[in-house]
């Protein structure tokens, strides 16, 4: 720049460093501008505008320096690293190494002992630590490709710590076991904390077989069975079972007629396989399905006799079993008996009047019509029905009453009745005469109407000649379906005649003997007999069984026949065995067990009404067994009282083989008192209950050694539907077997452990004495030091 005053313009100062910024240039420009302004203000001529140099460019240079690696440090001695000391140590090198090696050896020995102990506690562990360590390198490569499957941990049940002085017998008597773990991805389910062990097993339904029978001699004996179950209401033992007609008569208002042509209260007699055994039935049907159905029972009895008491050759004379239909007939009362209230009332009055005339009210058997009617009354009734000269040449004889007092209301074979009829008589007169003869044998029923005579005449052509073309079983079904009363009575007479012929010749007795030696009493027989006994004794008083105190030991519930049959099969009940039911109720299981297996049966019930019914059922069952030609066990008794105080229960438990306790609703105190009775049971006896007496976590130790539960070995089982009366579904029940070997083994091993401990003490007497001396010296030394400290403290205080 040129200066007009002859001087040079001041040169711009060079930047001090290459990193100067444009801000400095701007600062210089402002300075020069201010100086020129000041010069113009001083009167000097204006200067030319100077050119500003461009701002310098900033250049950033990055320099990379190579850092030298750190100096390598020599690795430390592994033994020195383990010991924590530096190489420079006060101890000599050899001694220091020896100490470290001994420490490592002790650690290895300790790890080996711990692994062995873990293997003994968990024997299912497959891999040891050494094997798992050697295979870790091989699994590490595969771990990147697929995820590891985590094994469930096994829970080991340890023993009690306060009984180590008895060796292994301070532990539980049951083997330790593991509980299954729940998968992490699944929902949490209930885990059984008490799995199967030697003393507690869960077998479910294994070994259960249907239709348990015991081959034995089942023929009825002439000597009465030993029993003390005498009915409370009567002092003398009845000689005959309660008939079906007696049960219906006592509740006649709930029944109505079923057959046409038989009147309001028709009676029929059914022959049984036993000697001179028969039963009287009223051929009526109930209005309600819950009531007793006499017609269905009669047909069921016929079917059972033909099925089980006859050989295939003998069965041909009765017909095919498929042709006999047995079903409930409740509510199927004749329409004529239900037209209006007046008709129903008159029908009931007629039935009551007929039953009163036959002396059938209140359980008394109807007398024979021949005993009620004289010759004059019979002649008058005959003349009223068919005229004076129609019957005098027939030659028909009215059958004599049975020696047992039961009226023979069912006619004998129609062929014998019509053998003396004149050949000149027409078909209508013959049919009418047959019907009149039937009516004469049923004098408690009204005379048949003309409609019934016509229906009887037009039923089949063979009926006019006194024979039926169908078999006996088929005729029963046809008469029931058609409501044909006369046909039903003729068919029943044919059945009685054929069965009596087999009974009189001894064929039925031989069949019963063969049946007993092959299979014993079939299920179809003992079930039917038990239903008959229950319907006659318990059925009329079933409402009284509901009178009990709720939430007490007297809550009533029954075990059904299917359940008892399963228990008998699993416990191998049979002859020469003793069965005891504690809380026997009405005695159903006593009756079933005695007849099905032939075992002695004893029961005890606290409540008065069920105990009374049980006594009556036992008597009725024995009478019915004789009617069927059968016999039960050698003894059957039902007692009333508390089984904890009853003397008979104490005596019979000493030789019992199976004890049944329905303790489903028992209080805990009752179960505890009941378990004390099990101490009298012999080895091998089984206790069946619905609640376990031995909990699954029971442990046999010195504390529980005196418990009555220590001698029981438990098996948990499952029952299905149809086994109990209070629930439709299934449940659990328990069979506890008396096994005193558990306690004996415990005591033997505990004694061996004690003797071994005493032997160790005797061998180390010197060591023990020396150790006692050292302990004594140590104690005296501590006391001397404490005394010195006390003296020092006293001196300080002074």
From Swiss-Prot:
Function text: Histone methyltransferase that specifically trimethylates histone H3 to form H3K79me3. This methylation is required for telomere silencing and for the pachytene checkpoint during the meiotic cell cycle by allowing the recruitment of RAD9 to double strand breaks. Nucleosomes are preferred as substrate compared to free histone.
EC number: 2.1.1.360
Biological process, per Gene Ontology: DNA damage checkpoint signaling; DNA repair; methylation; subtelomeric heterochromatin formation
Region (Disordered) location: 1-242, 372-425, 450-469
Note: In contrast to other lysine histone methyltransferases, it does not contain a SET domain, suggesting the existence of another mechanism for methylation of lysine residues of histones.
Gene: DOT1
Family in the record: Belongs to the class I-like SAM-binding methyltransferase superfamily. DOT1 family.
Binding positions (S-adenosyl-L-methionine): 556-559, 579-588, 605, 642-643
Regulation: Ubiquitination of histone H2B to form H2BK123ub1 is required for efficient DOT1 methyltransferase activity on histone H3.
SUPFAM superfamilies named among the record's database cross-references: S-adenosyl-L-methionine-dependent methyltransferases
One MF term in the entry's GO annotations: histone H3K79 methyltransferase activity
Sequence ranges of Basic and acidic residues compositional bias: 91-105, 155-168
Taxon lineage: Eukaryota, Fungi, Dikarya, Basidiomycota, Ustilaginomycotina
Keywords in alphabetical order: Chromatin regulator, Methyltransferase, Nucleus, Repeat, S-adenosyl-L-methionine, Transcription, Transcription regulation, Transferase
One GO cellular component term: chromosome, telomeric region
Catalyzed reaction equations: L-lysyl(79)-[histone H3] + 3 S-adenosyl-L-methionine = N(6),N(6),N(6)-trimethyl-L-lysyl(79)-[histone H3] + 3 S-adenosyl-L-homocysteine + 3 H(+)
Organism in which the protein naturally occurs: Mycosarcoma maydis
Protein's recorded name: Histone-lysine N-methyltransferase, H3 lysine-79 specific
